[in-house]
Amino acid sequence: MAKVLVLYYSAYGHIETMAYAVAEGAKSAGAEVTVKRVPELVPEDVAKASYYKVDQAAPIATVDELADYDAIIVGAGTRFGTVASQMRNFWDQTGGLWFAGKLVGKLGSVFTSSATQHGGQESTILGFIPTFLHQGMVVAGLPYAFQGQMGTEEVKGGSPYGASTITNGDGSRQPSEIELEGAKYQGAHVAKLAAKLA
């Protein structure tokens, strides 16, 4: 049974919702799944004043525990076309794991969100993939076998690089059913691949 970590950062709850959908998909494929988040870097008073969702139930991850999993599925919103600094900061602390080769051969995957359809989702996912490759990890996305990412009948996130959601500039749009299905598919896809690699 593959051990999968869904590791996320979510300021307003959209990525948190996607993370649990990813976890559901991974569990459906037989994986042992853990959902954790990275630490918040914004001072608590500023976060509350900015209406961040500060009451998230997932425990905080530690860098060293990354080595305990067969696959790590990372989720974070895009910030100006790249991954949120909270997630970047967490992975910037993995030098010891890199030096010891602790993540070599493990599977990595990414999902994200943005306020607009062209708000940097693909650049965020593609920009994170080198982190996995430097660690010696194998990368998986969201294959076109998930047909939900096809078509133009509605506004929706998702690409072959990974699941995603569009939130609107005011954060009022929650992940749609098709976006959550994409997240579940990605979780299941990664879990199946991780079981083969483990």
UniProtKB/Swiss-Prot annotation:
SUPFAM superfamilies linked: Flavoproteins
Record Pfam families: Flavodoxin_1
Keywords, comma-separated and alphabetical: Flavoprotein, FMN, NAD, NADP, Nucleotide-binding, Oxidoreductase
Residue sites binding NAD(+) per the record: Y12
Binding site for substrate: W98
Flavodoxin-like domain sequence ranges: 4-190
A GO MF label: flavin adenine dinucleotide binding
Catalytic EC class: oxidoreductase
Reactions performed catalytically: a quinone + NADH + H(+) = a quinol + NAD(+); a quinone + NADPH + H(+) = a quinol + NADP(+)
GO cellular component, one term: membrane
Cofactor (UniProt): FMN
EC numbers on record: 1.6.5.2
Flavoprotein listed as a keyword: yes
PROSITE patterns in the record: FLAVODOXIN_LIKE (PS50902)
Note on cofactor: Binds 1 FMN per monomer.
Residues bound to FMN: 10-15, 78-80, 113-119, 134
Sequence similarity: Belongs to the WrbA family.
Name of the protein in question: NAD(P)H dehydrogenase (quinone)
